[in-house]
């Protein structure tokens, strides 16, 4: 409520100092605030930022410890884990260095680009890193983004998701991680600069440049376009770590064409008879390949750390099914246990499931849908029957027979079967 001294002189709504006692008095909707109160607010916010950062940086595990934790949840991808662990560790150590006030050497932010086939673990790597570091994490799909003014999501909505994840704690959000998936889908349509509008390709890359590099962005707390009169939240993106991921289908042919052109004369005959797989080809990735694919040089420049993920083979998929802490088979066995039932999946069945996922080219992402389809009828029945054991064999996976259901009450031994560990033949 605005209070006036002697019906004339305005006063600060917070400290009650009169207008002539302060240097500035700033008016707002039905309130006034003086320059001294603004300075006090700024000091409080700076102190809160220091506390928030100290909580994050004081508990940063070393790169080796980060890798050890990642190994509990993610199978394979050792090189990608190592690169990510070092990058994330250095990023948060950089924040600690900046907060200390030491400006002797300016440390730049290093965002990350993950390249790998569908279901190779790009999203899971980013999610697990955020969980390890206990920082706000948000994920966005690049395919839904468009330039401002066109139908689709504005890039500022990515920052809004991070704010929501941080419960609108701005200081905490400014130290978070943003994962932008399907970034290969915003590649421009040709290698040459676009003459006409490319609102979902090159236009989105241009829009992402500033927030990825570091800027104070105006974030609409209620979403962008439906509430034009809302007050905006100012969010500094300078210390937000951006991780971009994509399958980049077809980039292997760009790499192959480049490497073949570079091999002439006698060098062309070396390894000509050895067919390289997709993972080996990606190891030879260069910046120029990304440019030819359709990423603009400025966008690539904001992603100095580039790492590739290997395509998962049959053994890796079986390990994903059984080994990690949150392995898919363990999850389904726990669900059956909640219904007082047991689930047994034979080794031959695990192999058949992995082969199906490979045939569908869905990687680890396809394993859950295959199991869900196999176990649907069993889960439907055991909820009523209770005290039953469901066994999945290779024949069940191949659709030749139904899952085998046996009553635990009628069997001589009611001992719970241990979780099966896959042992290759």
Swiss-Prot record:
The keyword Chaperone belongs to this UniProt entry's keyword annotation: yes
GO molecular function terms listed in the Swiss-Prot or TrEMBL record: ATP binding; ATP hydrolysis activity; ATP-dependent protein folding chaperone; protein dimerization activity; unfolded protein binding; zinc ion binding
Entry keyword annotation includes Cell inner membrane: no
Gene3D superfamilies named among the record's database cross-references: 1.10.8.60, ClpX chaperone, C4-type zinc finger domain (6.20.220.10), P-loop containing nucleotide triphosphate hydrolases (3.40.50.300)
Superkingdom to which the source organism belongs: Bacteria
GO cellular component: HslUV protease complex
Signal peptide bounds: none
Its biological purpose: ATP-dependent specificity component of the Clp protease. It directs the protease to specific substrates. Can perform chaperone functions in the absence of ClpP.
Protein name as catalogued: ATP-dependent Clp protease ATP-binding subunit ClpX
UniProt source species: Rickettsia canadensis (strain McKiel)
Gene name for this UniProt entry: clpX
């Amino acid at each position: 409520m605005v209070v006036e001294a002697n019906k004339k002189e305005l006063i600060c709504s917070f400290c009650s100092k009169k207008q002539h006692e302060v240097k500035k008095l700033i008016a707002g909707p039905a309130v006034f605030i003086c320059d001294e109160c603004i300075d006090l607010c700024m000091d409080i916010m700076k102190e809160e930022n220091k506390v928030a950062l100290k909580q994050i940086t004081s508990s940063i595990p070393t790169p080796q410890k980060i890798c050890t934790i990642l190994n509990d949840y993610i199978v394979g991808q050792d090189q990608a884990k190592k690169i990510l662990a070092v990058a994330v560790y250095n990023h948060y150590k950089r924040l600690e260095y900046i907060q200390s006030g030491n400006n002797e050497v300016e440390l730049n932010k290093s965002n990350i680009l993950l390249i790998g086939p569908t279901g190779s673990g790009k999203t899971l790597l980013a999610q697990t890193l955020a969980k390890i570091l206990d920082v706000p994490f948000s994920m966005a799909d690049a395919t839904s983004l468009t330039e401002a003014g066109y139908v689709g999501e504005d890039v500022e909505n990515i920052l809004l998701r991070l704010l929501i994840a941080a419960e609108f704690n701005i200081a905490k959000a400014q130290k978070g991680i943003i994962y932008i998936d399907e970034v290969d889908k915003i590649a421009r349509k040709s290698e040459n600069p676009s003459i006409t509008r490319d609102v979902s390709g090159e236009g989105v890359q241009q829009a992402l440049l500033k927030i990825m590099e570091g800027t104070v962005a105006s974030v609409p707390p209620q979403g962008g376009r439906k509430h034009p009169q809302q007050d905006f939240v100012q969010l500094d993106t300078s210390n937000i770590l951006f991780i971009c991921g994509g399958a980049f289908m077809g980039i292997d042919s760009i790499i192959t064409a480049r490497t073949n052109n570079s091999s002439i004369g006698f060098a062309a005959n070396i390894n000509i008879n050895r067919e390289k797989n997709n993972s080996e080809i990606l190891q030879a990735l260069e910046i120029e390949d990304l440019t030819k694919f359709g990423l603009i040089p400025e966008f690539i420049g904001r992603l100095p750390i580039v790492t590739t993920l290997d395509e998962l083979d049959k053994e890796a998929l079986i390990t994903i099914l059984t080994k990690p802490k949150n392995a898919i088979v363990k999850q389904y066995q726990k669900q059956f246990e909640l219904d007082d039932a047991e689930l047994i999946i034979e080794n031959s069945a695990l192999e058949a499931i992995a082969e199906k996922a490979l045939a569908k080219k869905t990687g680890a992402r396809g394993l859950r849908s295959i199991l869900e389809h196999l176990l649907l009828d069993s889960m439907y029945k055991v909820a009523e029957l209770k005290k039953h054991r469901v066994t999945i064999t290779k024949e069940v996976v191949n659709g030749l027979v139904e899952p085998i259901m046996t009553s635990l009450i009628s069997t001589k031994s009611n001992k719970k079967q241990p979780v099966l560990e896959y042992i290759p033949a």
